[in-house]
Regions:
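Acidic/polar surface patches and capping/hinge elements
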Residues: 23-414
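Positively charged n-region of N-terminal signal peptides that target proteins for export
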Residues: 1-5
Length: 414
């Protein structure tokens, strides 16, 4: 039975991995694509481990492996002494990715080994290839060791709601337990602390900001709202997936379009995923500091908020039917998308980039953008249209994501 289940899982990964690149993507983009595919596979990773941790470890290892040979920028954590200057950076990237993914996803060794062998066949045999593999493996082992005991593996404490207006309650219809309650205590990859850029508290329930944003999500956020345009309804559902996956796929498209070298791609994906990982740690710090209620709770219980300008709807559900199982403030999509757009615009020296993006939840449905910030802004408002967040959640999230990304690109991998 175990073997049968593993076979089914590997088939599922293969289904997610069928994207065909118009050109050889190189080891950095290929491993990124493979990791996104793994993370979309049910059961591939413990539900208590946030996917951005895996992404950051993978790309930190690849970057430091390549940079140990290339030495064009500062190391993230590891600058392997004595790495031959003529070693193959492609082999180093391939080996580093292989070592990390085997460590993080041991049940998927056949898939990971197969991808690794395909990458190695694209590299000429000889001493540079052998040396590159040695560098990549050694650096990856050190990065893995550095992240051991980072707090991600502890048992998440159970969140016990307090029945006070404004305080987070488990949400209908499933009333699932709050997730990632331990993530505020995970060691950041770059920040000094999880609270380094903690936003100010959410607005008071009787404030004009709260009133405006409450009524906005109440109006636009329910299923098939007559007040929402068909495009707003589509946007609300289009982005209702794992937002970090979208930004890694945008980076894949940009890296291939700009024909980045292996060293350039390694740096891009490291900056991106170190930023995203720390943004997640930072927003969970804020979420569990303020424990602010979700719109579905607020709208159903508006008769308890002492605000005469908010009216209850005891049957309200969001466009997406269910609500993410964590406090509302700050918003994750706003935070991650702002961080992703900021890193990409900084790396390429421009916000302008035309690309298509395929939805994770609407098979084959694409939307087109002409800038990174355009995609970020659409992801921001999508959570209002989806009935998931207040606008002030997303505003605070976007500021947090910008702050984290700014810190990373200013201080790391120069």
């Amino acid at each position: 039975m175990k073997a049968r289940n593993l076979c089914l899982i590997l088939i599922c990964v293969s289904c997610f991995s069928t994207k065909l690149f118009a050109q050889s993507p190189g080891p950095v983009v290929q491993w990124n694509h493979d990791l996104v595919s793994l993370l979309r596979t049910p059961g591939a990773q413990p539900a208590t481990i946030h996917p951005t941790r895996s992404m950051a470890i993978l790309h930190a290892a690849i970057y430091d492996a390549v940079n140990s040979i290339d030495r064009s920028h500062a190391a993230y954590k590891v600058l392997l002494p004595g790495a031959p200057a003529d070693a193959s950076v492609d082999a180093a990237a391939a080996a580093a990715g292989h070592e990390v993914l085997l460590n993080l996803f041991p049940a998927f060794q056949p898939f990971v080994d197969g991808e690794y062998q395909q990458l190695l066949t694209q590299i000429p045999d000889g001493a540079p290839k052998i040396e590159g593999v040695q560098v990549g493996t050694a650096v990856a082992d050190q990065i893995i060791q550095i992240r051991t005991g980072d707090g991600s593996g502890v048992t998440p404490p159970v969140f016990i709601p307090i029945n006070v207006p404004g305080d987070y309650q488990l949400t209908p219809p499933n009333f699932a337990a709050a997730v990632f309650t331990h993530w505020p205590n995970v060691t950041p990859f770059a920040l000094f602390s999880a609270s380094q850029f903690r936003p100010d508290p959410p607005p008071a329930l009787t404030s004009q900001t709260y009133t405006n944003d409450f009524n906005e999500v109440k109006t636009l956020g329910p299923p098939r709202s007559p007040a929402a345009t068909s495009d707003q309804q589509l946007i609300g559902v289009f982005w209702n997936g794992a937002i970090q996956n979208y930004w890694n796929e945008i980076a894949q498209t940009a890296a291939l379009s700009k024909q980045l070298t292996t060293a350039q791609a390694a740096r891009l994906f490291a900056l991106l995923n170190l930023s995203l990982a720390d943004t997640v740690i930072a927003f969970y710090d804020a979420k569990y500091t303020y424990t602010f209620w979700r719109p579905v709770t607020a709208i159903r219980a508006a008769d308890m908020d002492d605000n005469p300008d908010t009216q209850p709807d005891p049957n309200f559900l969001p466009e997406t039917k269910t609500t993410a199982a964590d406090p509302s403030y700050p918003g994750a999509h706003g935070a991650i998308s702002a961080a992703g757009a900021a890193v990409l615009a900084s790396f390429f020296g421009t916000d302008q980039f035309s690309f298509n993006l395929t939805s994770e939840v609407f098979a084959g449905v694409q939307r087109s953008f002409t800038s990174f910030s355009g995609a970020s802004q659409e992801a921001f408002v999508s959570r209002i249209y989806a009935g998931q967040h207040f606008r002030f959640d997303q505003t605070a999230g976007a500021q947090l994501g910008n702050n984290v990304a700014g810190f990373v690109v200013t201080n790391l991998l120069h």
